[in-house]
């Protein structure tokens, strides 16, 4: 029952902010190198393609992203969604998170999804 309620709340929260263009708050969870949660809302970083967890490069990217847990984030949402995640470009502690991950890990720009030509 607790898991059902948690899933409902996450889905409801995601739907509630899906129409918004920005989200600001605390990084509450890091799923992997290109997906974080801000105020428990999952955000898929636009234009960022990181290796998957379970690979050496993916685990390293996740570990690098973990250092931002508890930091303040400001995300510009593109209006797109993927699975349970909103898609957006985020700054964490006034640093472009996508650019930081590309400079410090094996993450690369995914040009097809760089909808605002940031990278």
Language-model features, listed with the residues they occupy:
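Small beta-barrel nucleic-acid-binding modules, primarily SNase/OB-fold domains
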Residues: 2, 11-119
């Amino acid at each position: 029952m607790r898991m059902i309620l948690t899933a409902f709340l996450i889905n409801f929260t995601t739907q509630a902010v899906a129409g918004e263009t920005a989200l600001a708050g605390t990084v509450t969870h890091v799923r992997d190198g290109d997906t974080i949660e801000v105020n428990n809302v999952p955000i898929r970083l636009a234009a960022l393609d990181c290796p998957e967890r379970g690979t050496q490069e993916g685990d390293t990217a996740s570990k690098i992203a973990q250092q931002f847990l508890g930091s303040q984030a400001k995300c510009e949402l593109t209006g797109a969604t993927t699975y349970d995640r909103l898609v957006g470009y985020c700054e964490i502690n006034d640093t472009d998170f996508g650019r930081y991950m590309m400079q410090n890990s094996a993450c690369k720009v995914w040009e097809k999804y760089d909808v605002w030509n940031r990278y």
